[in-house]
């Protein structure tokens, strides 16, 4: 891990994130770079990568197993996959929170039959294929992860066993009904890029 380059895209945070990140510089090859909305920050990090794979992870998630990242890379390499994701787990949330995240996981597995869906919380990409696809669409402010992963061939998409822990913060801010409605609308509009380009006020919530 000390030789693994970690790039943290910071969108002008005011909570001391850059200082916290750099406090690990004696143990990790870490760097803070200018960020923005998720698609902008992720593309900025990917443009600096020179490895065969690039892993996108949200700042508020935690791998459920220390071996998760290693297993994701091994799965991608052994099966020549272009994109690998994992299950999303909610620790400490309500039963409704857990059910909605479980529904997300079920949708991910079913997506392998139609159009792959990977959440940006944990998305391992073959860097060459990522660049060929043009990266994340920077004019899309919601579900940019789904829009990109849906362009991956089904045979090149995988889900590694295990998962990452996340919080119920988005449910608390937006409400379960609105999040579920937006998720379903997104799934039904997979073919309609103009839907993704609309302002769904996701980040204003």
Which residues fall in each region the model found?
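Glycine-rich, basic loop-to-helix element that forms the pyrophosphate-binding segment
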Residues: 33-49
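Short beta-strand/loop segment that forms part of the nucleotide-sugar
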Residues: 2-12, 31-34
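Acidic donor-binding loop at a coil-to-helix junction in glycosyltransferase catalytic cores
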Residues: 142-148
């Amino acid at each position: 891990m000390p030789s693994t380059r970690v790039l943290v895209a910071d969108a002008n945070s005011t909570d001391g994130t850059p200082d916290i990140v750099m406090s690990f510089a004696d143990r990790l090859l870490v760097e803070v770079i200018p960020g923005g909305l998720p698609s902008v920050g992720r593309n900025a990090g990917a443009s600096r990568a020179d490895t065969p794979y690039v892993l996108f992870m949200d700042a508020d998630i935690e791998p459920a197993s220390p071996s998760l990242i290693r297993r994701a890379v091994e799965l991608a390499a052994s099966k020549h996959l272009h994109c690998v994701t994992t299950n999303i787990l909610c620790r400490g949330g309500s039963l409704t929170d857990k059910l909605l995240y479980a529904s997300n996981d079920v949708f991910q597995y079913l997506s392998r039959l139609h159009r792959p869906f990977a959440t940006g919380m944990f998305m391992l990409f073959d860097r060459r294929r990522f660049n060929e696809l043009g990266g994340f669409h920077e004019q899309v402010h919601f579900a940019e992860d789904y829009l990109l992963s849906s362009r991956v061939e089904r045979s090149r998409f995988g889900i590694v066993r295990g998962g990452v822990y996340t919080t119920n913060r988005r449910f608390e801010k937006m409400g379960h009904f609105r999040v579920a409605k937006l998720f379903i609308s997104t799934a039904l509009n997979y073919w309609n890029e103009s839907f993704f380009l609309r302002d769904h006020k996701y980040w204003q919530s």
